[in-house]
Amino acid sequence: MKLSLLLTAALTAIAPLGAADWTQFRGPNGDGLSGETGVPVRMEPSSLTWSIALPGRGLSSPLILGDKVFVTAGSGARQDRLHVLCFRVTDGSLLWERQFWATGRTMTHEKIGAATPTPASDGKAIYAIFSSNDCVALDLDGRLLWFRGLGRDYPNASNSLGMSSSLVVVDGVVVAMVENDSESFTAGLDARTGVNRWKLDRPKKANWTSPVVFKSPGQPNRVLLQSAQGVTAVDPTTGKIAWDITEGASTVPSLVVSQGRLVIPANGITVVEPGAGDAKPKSIWRSAQLRPGTASPVVVGGRLLTLNDGGILTCADAQDGKRLWQLRLKGSFSATPVVAGGHLYCVSEEGRVQVVDPSKAEGIVVSELALEQTVIGTPSIAAGSLFVRSDSRLVRLGGTALR
């Protein structure tokens, strides 16, 4: 196996993840939900705690672990300078920054960039991947643990629009989806060393969805891989396929797990329920009326919400898919909504934060705040705050000192 650079090191033992940590795309459970309290419902200019400039563009969500917030960026005319930065949650001060040269293709669609995928953390390290298929592991103090140039190891693994699948880390394995029209695969990288634990050939079609960890009491963890062909569940430690759903799925918004069911964007929404062990999931319901755009669906309080690119927020009963209401939000949307305190936080591409109460007979916009910045990436929630990453800045809304 070719490694562009491989440094191995023992990972420093630290305390377990706190309940408020935001450790991957769409939060600790990959569903967009946070148990955090105190996030402002009434967004107003005074909600701005701090706003700091970033050295480059990116769509990746911030990760928050304790009093540290981590974010990636890409800079340079060719987006070939890759950055991982760490700031202090309380005041936004820079704690450290690490830079790397990209080894793979960095050209992307103008709307995205090199730092599109969201990193992941197991509480011991930050694992970041870029559109160039460069993957790096750093400890929480910024020390390099390992670096994989997957774009160099697998030079045909790219697409003309750019790669955007985020990482997950589970059972000591970092799962990277590198799915495209040519050399398409998903790999399980050893979290300690970056070496392949396994590599699974995948459908040869461009795919921008992200892997999702499926946990069931008393059962081994599974990683769900979504593609145009459907959803595949794999053992994260071996890459062995546990089961397949082959009825097709979206290649942009990712599925979400709620109450043991999979809510899959697939020409609308398809909901399935896995059986005992590795039995193939059974279909629960389908709806062509619920059509997410770029944003992934979210389920809160028994209600399923989808948001399309034009700002139409649709709410349905999560049990049967019956549509309850629709609400037009201001602006266009790429970011997935996130939830705290039963409220939906939606951030438009124009940087307008809109807080929605989805629990009533009709959706209600409780408050809104114009950041006047371009926002494509999904926000994060921790420390009583909403963290929004724009094209040029990282913003904290709400919260004071870390509790």
Predicted segments with their positions:
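Bacterial N-terminal signal peptides
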Residues: 4-16
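Noncatalytic, solvent-exposed loop/strand surfaces
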Residues: 17-403
